[in-house]
Every structure is written in C-alpha cells, then in structure tokens.
Amino acid sequence: MNPPLKFLTEPFLQFPTESSVKVVWFTEFMGDGHAVSFGGNLLETVFTKNIRPIRLREDKYSRVGTQIAEGEVYEKPVFREIWRHEAHLTNLTPGKRISYRVSSIGEDNELISGRTYTLEPAPPPGRPLNILLTSDHQIKPMVAANLQKVKETFKRIDAVFFAGDLVNIPDRASEWFDDNRGNAFFPCLQGRAKYVMKYDGVETTYRGGQIIQTAPIFPCIGNHEVMGRFNTGKSLNEEFNDTIPRHIANDLYGEKSLESLKDKSFNTDTFENIFSLPEDETGKKGYYAVTFGDVRLIVLYVTNMWRYNNT
C-alpha cells in the first residue's frame, strides 16, 4: 500500500504586481492536476504550470530520511524526483487581501488540499510596510529560532527580501525541503521547522515562522546558489567547489551550446527552477528590479565563486 500523499512544502508567494501574484508549492509526485482556489468562498480556480528541477539530488553528506550519518544510505549523488507547481493569479484588487488554498491530485486520483491562507497583490504607494531583510540561512542552527522570534514580534510581514545564500549546497534537495535535523530552508520560513537546541540542560524546539505563505519572497543569487561542474561522480560538496569560468570550459572542452557549457563550468539552474524570476524576451537573467509599495528593489547578480586573497 502506498503512503498517503502529502505536500513537500506549504505554498509561498512570489512577484506580486498591482493586480497579480504567483503561488508556488512543491510535491514529490507529478500528479494529475494542481490548482489554487481563491477569492470569496474559494470559488475561483487557477491551474498550475509544473516543472521538475532536474538537478536536485541527495548524496553521502545529506541528512534526509533515515540517513543521519555520512554515507548510511547514499554513497554517491542520487537524483530525487521533486515537482514545482506555480499558479498565476490575476485580476486582483490592490489593497484587498483574499483567501487562497492549494490542491494537488495524485496519479491515483487522491486529492490533497492545504490550509487556507491569504494573499494580496503588490501594496499601493504610501502604505507602511514591514519588510524582513535576511540572508545566509544555509541550514544554520539559529535560523529557526530567529524566524520564530520575527513572527512573534511582527504579526504582519509584508515581504521578504532575501540577500543570497539561501542554502549551503543548492543541488542538495533536503537542504531546501526536509533535512532531518529540522531546519531546512522552506520549513523555517513556513513555521514547519523542528530544530532542537539545548541550553543550560533544557531542550527547546524551534519551528520558524509562517511567513512566506502570506508575504512574497524576493530572492537574490549568492555564491551558495551556484553549482560547479555537473554530474561528475563527485559528492555534491565537491561539485559545489568545482566551478570554472565559461570561457575556460570552452577552451578545455570545446563545448558550444549553453547547456553543455553550464555542465562543464557552473550553473544556477536549481535556484532558477525553485523560484520565479522576471523574464524578458531572452529569458531569465538572475537579476531584476521591481517596485513594491514605496520601495524600489534592485537585485544584482554579482556573486563571485572565485576568491582571491588580495581582494
């Protein structure tokens, strides 16, 4: 008997405009349909665009499932099937917060629905905002506690500006979703963390905060969103540390297409597949600028994987 279906994440919000917002969530199954119900009595429905971030893997350094020590389950990198679902809600009213709920249908027609949350499009100018500026979570010990305190202090958070280094190794799926130490990226920002800290003989479990279910997140690429040469048989840690410039890869391997050059040099594919990024006619750029209320947010792509001791 198959285990019951469940969501891999709660829904989260991205890139609101004055009349729209994107709702995103993840599962470990492709499914037969995924949708967002929203509005009065949840009577309106939008179906999703679905993709599989194909570089997500686990390896001997993962802490996921029953693997609590190095190499207990995974001796080398193993691909993990994870699906991203994105619905674009349009024709929203500025300043009006409405209810929404996500649903997914499995291949056997089993239906699962999430909790009901609220969303709204981008705030109008002149409205006071509470914006969380954060960075460098990287499954660090204090993240869940800090985010729990944020939510206890500010009942309403309007947006999250994330200045890079969201996880430690971007192609390691469990760092985003379900590290068994309880402090993966999404659980901490969605109030589902279970990170235990011990102080003065007392154990306390910190759960992070329910933040990005109702406040859009605007991410930025840091050096920990960049992976190196792909699928080399090395550990994910070694791949992360194996970046080389594209022109060097071209000289070494003679690769002509962008995809093959990325495999032989560096890439930000997992970051770009996990988050919605604004696009122009040539596709995603990794950098962007948006207006959010009275704030003009400019996000650069200036991370440097190659460090020098004199800079």
Specify the residue positions occupied by each region the protein language model found.
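Metal-dependent phosphoester/phosphodiester hydrolase catalytic core
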Residues: 2-311
